[in-house]
């Protein structure tokens, strides 16, 4: 069984990493109230022009985030979900078309 000391060290390392990365990515604040059937856009800007990998995660209530979509070039589309990347403006967005109640979640932008 993992000791409390080990857990605290792991938590400290994770918090230190988050603190060091704090200005790298900015995401539009939420929450958004979107009527069913509408299109919603989540926007994210990043400051490191050397970034190569871009990801959108979906986190349902009280669950771990799950990878929704990865983007390595200008964009990616999967059904009702579209990710668009503009490297010149250091901007990435996630569009959800024909929104459904089941789309209710937290959406997270990750830049690597």
UniProtKB/Swiss-Prot annotation:
Disulfide bonds: 44-109
SMART domains registered for this protein in UniProt: IGv
Top-level taxon in the UniProt lineage: Eukaryota
UniProt-listed InterPro entries: Ig-like_dom (IPR007110), Ig-like_dom_sf (IPR036179), Ig-like_fold (IPR013783), Ig_V-set (IPR013106), TCR_variable_domain (IPR051006)
Glycosylated residue positions: 43
Gene Ontology MF terms: peptide antigen binding
PROSITE patterns linked to this entry: IG_LIKE
GO BP: any one term: adaptive immune response
Subunit structure: Alpha-beta TR is a heterodimer composed of an alpha and beta chain; disulfide-linked. The alpha-beta TR is associated with the transmembrane signaling CD3 coreceptor proteins to form the TR-CD3 (TcR or TCR). The assembly of alpha-beta TR heterodimers with CD3 occurs in the endoplasmic reticulum where a single alpha-beta TR heterodimer associates with one CD3D-CD3E heterodimer, one CD3G-CD3E heterodimer and one CD247 homodimer forming a stable octameric structure. CD3D-CD3E and CD3G-CD3E heterodimers preferentially associate with TR alpha and TR beta chains, respectively.
Protein name in UniProt: T cell receptor alpha variable 12-1
Protein source organism: Homo sapiens
């Amino acid at each position: 069984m993992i000791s409390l000391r080990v857990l605290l060290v792991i938590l400290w390392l994770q918090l230190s990493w988050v603190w060091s990365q704090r200005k790298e990515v900015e995401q539009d604040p939420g929450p958004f109230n979107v009527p069913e059937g509408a299109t919603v856009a989540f926007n994210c800007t990043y400051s490191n022009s050397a970034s190569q990998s871009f990801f959108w995660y979906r986190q349902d209530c009280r669950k771990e985030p799950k990878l929704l979509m990865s983007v390595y070039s200008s964009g990616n589309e999967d059904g009702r979900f579209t990710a668009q990347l503009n490297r010149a403006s250091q901007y990435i967005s996630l569009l959800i078309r024909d929104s459904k109640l089941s789309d209710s979640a937290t959406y997270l932008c990750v830049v690597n």
